[in-house]
Amino acid sequence: MSRIYEQIEKDVEKIIGQYDGDKNGEVTINEAIEFFKRMGSKYPEKCAIVLFKMYDLDNEGKISYDEIQEEIFKRYQDKVREDQIKQYFQDDIEAFLLRYDKNRDNRIDFKELEQCFESIGSDHPKENANHIFTEIDKNRDGYLTIAEIKNYCRNTIRSKPYYQS
């Protein structure tokens, strides 16, 4: 993990070096506009404004090495968290299929799901299975596929207030 952070630091130094016209370690809005002009941007002012909205964390009108590094680290950590969540659900889906896909066709039919609820002691296994099928079986073919389950989990996570992408 530390090699990744070292690479991010090197990349941030390159970024600052490209934008920082007077080489003082900070980038002003004018330096960013000049950089985008040199790069041939049709909209250098707009590009600079977007850059500053992303990285001028303290709204001082200049971007420092620390601000860029902090934002890149934050985005990297958010990506790692998202990848961990995806892996968690992938593992859960596979374990669910291994346990309840009795005929090993890589999908769950209504009866298999009903038996799943029975095995965990549900008082209303048929109603629970029906509810799940209504929510997840989007093509109404009578089977829950890995893709449908993943899609449902992904949409459910994104609708929660604690998840930010």
From Swiss-Prot:
Molecular function terms from GO: calcium ion binding
Binding annotation for Ca(2+) 2: 56, 58, 60, 62, 67
Entry-linked InterPro entries: EF-hand-dom_pair, EF_Hand_1_Ca_BS, EF_hand_dom
Binding of Ca(2+) 4, residues: 137, 139, 141, 143, 148
Domain of life: Eukaryota
Pfam families documented for this protein: EF-hand_7, EF-hand_8
The entry's keywords: Calcium, Metal-binding, Repeat
Chain residues that bind Ca(2+) 1: 20, 22, 24, 26, 31
Domain EF-hand: 7-42, 43-78, 88-123, 124-159
Metal-binding found in the keyword field: yes
Chain residues that bind Ca(2+) 3: 101, 103, 105, 107, 112
SUPFAM superfamilies: EF-hand
PANTHER family named among the record's database cross-references: CALCIUM-BINDING PROTEIN, RETICULOCALBIN
UniProt name for this protein: Calcium-binding protein H
Natural source organism: Dictyostelium discoideum
